[in-house]
């Protein structure tokens, strides 16, 4: 009997650790994305001198991967959900990091669609 209770205690500790880690990661992602979202509008206006129409077009293109999210997730069905989410977060991080290097509006479109693919992969998991 003690063997079962030891095993259950270890499982409970691992589960608690995983939930704490998950909570911390969700907080960090949410905080970082909130900072990005608030700075992005100013970056478009002040650095890239984008018009409201340009912003609307960019936002429209950014949502295309969202429409294709089920198809993207379906192609990765052989992977575990946690791996797909990790891939999505990595793509999002690289894309958002590359946003600051966009010297003009045209590269920004590609970068935004790129990180949107990762974000929508993550969000579907």
Residue ranges, per PLM feature:
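Helix-loop boundary and gating motifs at the non-cytosolic
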Residues: 6-66, 107-109, 114, 123
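Generic alpha-helical transmembrane segments of integral inner-membrane proteins
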Residues: 31, 64, 68-71, 90, ...
């Amino acid at each position: 009997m003690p063997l079962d209770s030891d095993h259950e205690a270890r499982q409970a500790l691992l589960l608690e650790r995983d939930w704490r880690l998950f909570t911390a990661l969700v907080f960090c992602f949410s905080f970082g994305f909130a900072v990005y979202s608030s700075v992005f509008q100013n970056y478009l206006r002040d650095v890239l001198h984008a018009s409201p129409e340009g912003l609307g077009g960019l936002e429209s293109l950014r949502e295309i991967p969202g429409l294709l999210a089920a198809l993207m997730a379906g192609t990765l069905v052989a992977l575990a959900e946690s791996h797909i989410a990790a891939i999505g977060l990595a793509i999002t991080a690289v894309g958002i990091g590359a946003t600051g290097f966009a010297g003009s509006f045209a590269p920004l479109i590609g970068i935004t669609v790129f990180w949107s693919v990762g974000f929508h992969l993550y969000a579907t998991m």
